[in-house]
């Protein structure tokens, strides 16, 4: 009976998922007109104090943007991006406190 109880308790441990990037707008590798916002949507709610994103141009220069983290998304508000290539680098932490990092690129058309 004790073995059965121990087996049941071991099987009942919580399953933790990580806050992985589910979608982005603009999408990775997309060519778009200058976007008013960049939205990253994750697979679970984020810990705002430990999640964020940065935007850089093709030369790697950081582009200043307003940022918002709430629920399962990160929103960047760029101001008039010029034509060219851009890279979004993000980091997310969900309720399991595991940090995930990633990036994607997109192009702004003339």
Q: Where in this protein do the model-derived segments appear?
A:
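A glycine-anchored, Pro-Gly-centered beta-turn/N-cap motif
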Residues: 82-88
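Extended, polar beta-sheet/loop recognition surfaces of beta-rich domains
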Residues: 33, 37-44, 97-110
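Cleaved targeting-peptide boundary
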Residues: 17-25
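Beta-strand-rich extracellular modules
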Residues: 91-95
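Short beta-strand segments within Ig-like beta-sandwich modules, predominantly Fibronectin type-III
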Residues: 65-70
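Short, surface-exposed alpha-helix to beta-strand junction/turn motifs within ectodomains of secreted
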Residues: 38-40, 44-63
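Short beta-strand segments of immunoglobulin-like
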Residues: 27-31
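N-terminal signal peptide c-region/cleavage motif recognized by signal peptidases
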Residues: 12-14
């Amino acid at each position: 009976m004790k073995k059965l109880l121990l087996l049941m308790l071991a099987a009942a441990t919580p399953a933790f998922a990580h806050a992985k990037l589910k979608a982005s707008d603009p999408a990775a590798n997309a060519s778009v007109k200058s976007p008013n916002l960049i939205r990253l949507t994750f697979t679970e709610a984020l810990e705002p104090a430990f999640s964020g994103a940065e935007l850089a141009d093709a030369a790697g220069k950081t582009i200043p943007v307003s940022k918002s983290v709430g629920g399962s998304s990160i929103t960047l508000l760029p101001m008039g991006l010029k034509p060219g290539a851009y890279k979004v680098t993000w980091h997310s932490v969900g309720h399991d406190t595991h940090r995930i990092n990633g990036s994607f690129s997109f192009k702004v058309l003339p």
